[in-house]
Amino acid sequence: MSVKDRILQWVRPEVQALSAYHVADASGLIKLDAMENPFDFPAALKAELGVDLRDAAINRYPDPDAGAIRTALRELYSLPASADMLFGNGSDEIIQILAMAVAGPGRTILSVEPSFVMYKMIATFIGAEYVGVPLNDDFQIDAQTTLDAIKRHQPALVFIAQPNNPTGNLFDDETLRQIVAASPGLVVIDEAYTAFTNADYMSWVSEYDNVVVMRTFSKVGLAGLRFGMLFGAQEWIEQLNKVRLPYNINCLTQNAVLTAIRHFPEFVKQTEALREQRSWLSAQLDGVAGVTVYPSEANFILVRVDLPAKSVFSEMKRRGVLIKLLDGGHPKLAGCLRLTVGSHEENEAMLKALSGALAAVRG
């Protein structure tokens, strides 16, 4: 039997039908496709980080509970006393932990669409059913349709990204409360972009018995560390910890995260600068003919172009700027591109590349 035949026989058909998550090559390009913080660590923080990493006991397994981080985060986020936390190797691992513990074959994971692609991908990985409820044309939640879907499918897990990725907007609180009240299982509020908005749902973990909140340090400047966080009632965290792999946060990441928390005001300054750049960039994009700009509460801006989006994307790449092509990913994203908010210099270069690309495609 050939390798191909064995794969056809033994790899689950739904996995064979998938494509591996693609990360574009950004070599030599201004990278504005992945919502990363463009600013480097301050020199003094880098020096301190170097010492902390040097002192890490890499010959030993790391603290399995990352206890020092737990203490630091409880103070940083003013976590309710009744709440606990769980850490993952990025938010992706936390989504996987949630799905493994709560969903599975014969159960349903529900989210709105378009939203973060990993909700659907991980549902497929674990053999759960996935239900995606389309957003309205303005990318707000269709409350009645969503509530009807919850009633019909009785999802074990509901994921809501707030602000939403890739659209960048916030959903209104009243609709979210209706979803929480109607959901029979666990509702996960994904606050990956919380640093760029005033919205905060941490109090909901004590207000509701079926809500957990997910956050990450990736968007504030620590994407390379892959550190995700989940906050919820102690009883939920106790169950979820049973499927978390031991020692999943390595000692270098633990030391680096502690260093970052000690200097968190520096990262707050950077996120404030990016929020200012977002406002400036949105205003500039509003003046570009043929471009529709959508409101954003994240560190990226969704735009729709009146030309073939793939051609505009390719022309921008040819001009040295890499953005995210969303056209083709979901019917409601036809003609759409996602632009990460970078430094002022990067944003100026992106605007220049966009103008040139539009002119080239328009002919």
Curated annotation (Swiss-Prot):
Principal EC category: transferase
Keyword terms, alphabetized: Amino-acid biosynthesis, Aminotransferase, Histidine biosynthesis, Pyridoxal phosphate, Transferase
Keyword set includes Iron-sulfur: no
Any GO BP: L-histidine biosynthetic process
GO MF, one example: pyridoxal phosphate binding
Classification via NCBIfam families: hisC (TIGR01141)
HAMAP family, sorted: HisC_aminotrans_2
The protein's name: Histidinol-phosphate aminotransferase
Record gene name: hisC
